[in-house]
Amino acid sequence: MTHENPEPVAAAGQPSPPRIDLRNAFALLIAAIVAAGVALEIRGFRAGNLFDTDIWEPQGMRRLVHYIALFLVAAVPVMVLVPWCFAGLAIGLAGVGTALAAGPLAPLAVLLFLVSACALGSRLLGRAPDDSLPGQALATMLGSAVYIFPMTFLARLPVNYPLVWAVLLAIPIVRDMAGVRSRLAACADSLRRVELRSWGERAAAALLIFVLGMHWLVALKPEVGADALAMHLAIPANLAAHHRMTFEPSRFIWAVMPMGADWIYSIVYQLGGEAAARLANFAMLLTLVAMLYGAARRWLARPAALLVAALFATTPLVQLVTGSLFVENVLAALVLAMLAAIWRLGETGNRRYLFAAAILAGGALTTKVGALPLVVLAIPFAAAEARRHWRQLSPRPARTCVVALLLLAATAAPTYVIAYQKTHNPLFPFLNRKFPSPFLDHKEEIATGYHNPVNLRTLYDITFHTRKYLEASDGSFGFQYLLLAPLSLAGLLAIRGRPALSAAVIGLGAAFLTLRSDSNARYIYAALPLATIPFAAVLGWTASHSRALYRALIACTVVCAGLNVYFLPASGWYHRDFYSPYTFARHGGDRYLEHAAPERLVIRRYNQLHAGATVLLAADTNIADVRGEVYENSWHQWNVAIAIQHATELPAMQSLFDQWKVTYVIAPVRRAGAMLQPPFLRDFLDSCTALEYRLGGYELSQVTGECRGKQPMPVPMAVDTRPMAAVSAGTYDDFDPALHFDGDWEQSRSFTGAYRNTITFTDRPGAGVRFAFNGQAVTYMFTRSFNRGYADVRIDGVDYASIDLYSPKSEWQAKRRFTVTPGPHTIEVRVAGRKSPASAGQFVDVDGFVVE
């Protein structure tokens, strides 16, 4: 056996001068990147005033302080006295707490699925699988991908019963009972070996458990997320209620989209209900973190690897996709498992890992079409590893590679074949003009969310101007990636090893391609763990070659993690109150929903009183709780929403309700500043329905038919009756409570060119906004666009201006300044009901006011 020294040796065994020069040059490059990154971070915080935004609700901040105090009281004594018990105690307490909060069935259902998936994946990987925690995570994701495949077909058949899935999940466990015992013993042994000897290791482990505990607490809350209640929880609930999925693309526009994650949620939902689905999502995060930790251990000692895993877990986006049922945790875990299988192929030459990578890639594509760039970029690396072990793969390696490609196609294609068979569009509802479907007007094109140019500013903007890339607050992307991305690219110059190279190319390349197509920050979530891996490699290099740089990177990591923790709720609007105070209380879920999502309780009341009756959700997409026939006035039911928009007279609206057999309506209570689209629908509901139940701003009403043949009576305009108080100098967004809206207005957070991404708009004549201020000048901010009309401006009851907001091209944050005598004043902006001949509408919007 020969040993090949990787470096030329000079006198006394010292590296040659050229090698030293290269190391020094690379160290200087890393130092320059760190210095530039820190400077950009400081500039971003100063320019963006991020700490001035309302990240936490007051009660949320109090709960965070309580959580920190409780964690320290519990963790510090354990860390000092018996640190080897810390991991086991944390897992035990989490298990007991989960059972108390969600009931025993939910965690048992998730545990059954995970053990079954791990057993199935381990059997597929061979008789001598890797029983380490990252190895078991890989096997679990492989088994999950296998379960996703048949569920694509079974979901549409009436075979989905709890007993059926309990038996199906039990089969791999029974067939591999010895392996299950061995893996459980290996897990127990791993816990015993987590001794946390050094203080650095203890601190890193504590940080990881701390932030995972925060995600666990929000995962225990009832679902309140719009996407989940409209689709990702609705699918499991529908399947459990009818034993098959009854959603069809003729009405539900998303009914044939990729649903790999939803199939996993559906399996556990049948056994443990909603809580099981949410816990399965959290379990996918744990699996992802375990694999990321395993990848970091290739270059780092345990303390630093734990810190890298914790850094990813602190990313605010993690709380967004873990605190509500999104698909991103499942997708990211499948993608990282695919990459881990490719690495194992390179290390072992075992063709089973090639097949595993293919199945995992197919599972990722079945979960989200956005996985395509990740899979495409991974294929060359899998091919390279197969080429390196060409003779070892099998006696017929070419056939083996063809089988792998067929496995990928076979596991990925069914979702898109079903979509094509049902709609004539494999990507329905997108690309409708290229693949015309009978369910959409051929001129319609469903637009995706955000479209920002990808350039050298993108990384800075997505970090500090996150509102342009996500319906969230600035700073919600995570502060580490401004450093990680350039460090990962720089690492390609000096870090040896294909794992770091493949992770960097696939992660950063897929993120670039995705942002060019749709710059929604959530869509590159699956690339973030991959981008973290080459950073771990760079960190490992500095540990060996520059301790000063290593300590600087560790310090940056800790600071970024701390900032991320503070900004965790910035990634959405659902968890700014942190955990629910009723988590462990009897009927705590309903008590939480009373103020967080009262429409869910109104829908339950409808289910109890009118099972089987058809209901229209007038301004909501929460169909997860509906057990009868449901229509939505939203883009999720595109044709329904279009039909309602076109029904501008009573006979047409009444005809729709008769055609759909709608007898009940759930709608928000009419109030000042809240608009129901189209406005005629509000008039119809006010005149033609009778109130039956009201809770938390939502009403259940019965269609009476009393106004049949009559035009709806006009309803007095709702007026904001809150007392007005003059505000001082500053900029006030349209969502600020200092603004008082009268009449029907619609508020949106999804306008990327607007101030803070928010706009409030209406075309109702007479509707207005009042704003009291104390100053010498006030500026009205608005948007000029193709469908704008005139806005009449009055100050202290005196007419000041009539502004034409029309422009053939959108002009964001347009301004009109008015000077007044110093002191308190009130400005009013009202919809004039007039427009220029070229305008397509008479809309008026409010983007904010600036007081001087």
Task: Please report, for each region that a protein language model flagged, where it lies by residue.
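Membrane-interface helix-loop-helix junctions at transmembrane boundaries of multi-pass membrane enzymes
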Residues: R193-E201, R297-L300, A304, G349-R352, ...
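Membrane-interface transmembrane helices that cradle and orient dolichyl/undecaprenyl
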Residues: L125, M338-Y353, R388, L539
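Signature aromatic-anchored transmembrane alpha helix within multi-pass, membrane-resident enzymes
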Residues: E201-L208, R352-I359, V375-I379, P397-A409, ...
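Short periplasmic/luminal acceptor-recognition loop of GT-C membrane glycosyltransferases, typified by
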Residues: R591-S634, Y664-R670, S701
